[in-house]
Amino acid sequence: MRGQQTPPQQPTRVRTPRENENEVLGVIEQMLGASRVRVRCMDGKLRMGRIPGKLKRKIWVREDDVVIVTPWEVQSDEKCDVIWRYTKGQVDWLNRKGYLDFMR
């Protein structure tokens, strides 16, 4: 069936932020270059996020992507590491479950 799009897959498991590991949901607001992004986090803070070297080629992020970040031990209000990016189906699931209410 050429030209027809397949319906989006329902995610079977969606990784949620682990509070005991200090993980926070965020949305990419701006690409800064040099593996840096500006992230609006669910705790209301605007942080500069870094994509670590081991994930640089695995995680391709764009503006408005929903990600999981871990704030740094030092300067935790200003800087963070991006550790996970959600797909479109996973973002829909997070919306339905109420995880993305901070974006409104």
Swiss-Prot record:
Pfam families: eIF-1a. SMART domains: eIF1a. Coiled coil: none annotated. The keyword Transcription regulation does not apply. Keywords: Initiation factor, Protein biosynthesis. Disulfide bonds: none annotated. GO terms for molecular function: RNA binding; translation initiation factor activity. Residues 1-14 have a biased composition (Low complexity). InterPro entries: NA-bd_OB-fold, RNA-binding_domain_S1_IF1, TIF_eIF-1A, TIF_eIF-1A_CS. SUPFAM superfamilies: Nucleic acid-binding proteins. Seems to be required for maximal rate of protein biosynthesis. Enhances ribosome dissociation into subunits and stabilizes the binding of the initiator Met-tRNA(I) to 40 S ribosomal subunits. HAMAP family: aIF_1A. PANTHER family: EIF-1A. This is Translation initiation factor 1A. It comes from Methanococcus maripaludis (strain DSM 14266 / JCM 13030 / NBRC 101832 / S2 / LL). The gene is eif1a.
